[in-house]
Amino acid sequence: MTAAATVAALVLAGIVAGATPRLTVQPTSIARGGVVTVSGKGCRAGDLAYLISPPFVGNAFVAHSVATRARSNGSFSRRVHIRTSIHAGRYLITARCGGGNLGVSARLRVY
């Protein structure tokens, strides 16, 4: 398969799935050692979604990542513990599923 055909297949798969990727975090501001819920959509049903951010406790894909499985509608949600040793600041949360980046992010403030 050529590179153009691969890209076209990926674009078509996204259109067929009809899911505009989304990623949210609640609450958006948390104390060190707290727990947040990261939710999103845009994965294929059954895919593992990897949630990645420096404050996260976990090593599912890379350091500071956790995993959850996408539901039949492509949505996912996971409660995530925040490291107690992280510096206060603003952090980006990203997600991967189906072998690539979801292409969206959420922001979290840790105090």
Place the predicted regions along the sequence by residue.
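Extracytoplasmic/secretory-pathway segments with low complexity and glycosylation-like composition
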Residues: 1-111
